[in-house]
């Protein structure tokens, strides 16, 4: 059986994968052990015999050793690129001590394509355009720039014969979404509490969502 390590596992993607595994879906891929690194991990009371979950309740910068695993999902993020770089460098340092090179998935974002001015579907062949990224306002600009920065780091890691995949994720919905600060969460929580639903836009907005189970299965 295989072992999986999720770095930054308290976020929506990390928690969704854990729930997916608890419901026996990861057994298909022969994963029966999950390690979760997170400073703010929301511990799940897992009583399932088919899968074991271990929490490492620390910051990446405070970790000197990680368990030997077959797969790593890197979900760590920080709007400060300097701090994000420190996380990655610490990860790289620890990775060198692994006896066997694990497969690595970095969760990037569709934000790296920049602001979609023409309202057309982004294609994987589309090149990253820093001018379009600069068209973002607020937190999203920093978020996109951090993802671009880390993508380059993981591409360099792939050149060292690591099996690296980069997932440019967009918007998701699922069981855990109501616990996170997203637009769709606000709408659902308002409806559940029978409050007025407020849309912070004066124009028609169209948004597509992937379910977290489909994300985890992929």
Task: Show which residues each predicted segment covers.
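N-terminal Rossmann NAD(P)H-binding glycine-rich loop of SDR-like oxidoreductase domains
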Residues: 2-27
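N-terminal Rossmann-fold cofactor-binding loop
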Residues: 37-41
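NAD(P)H-binding glycine-rich loop region in Rossmannoid oxidoreductase-like domains
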Residues: 54-97
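Conserved Rossmann-fold NAD(P)-dependent oxidoreductase catalytic core, especially the SDR/UDP-sugar
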Residues: 92-142
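Active-site YXXXK catalytic motif of short-chain dehydrogenase/reductase
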Residues: 143-147
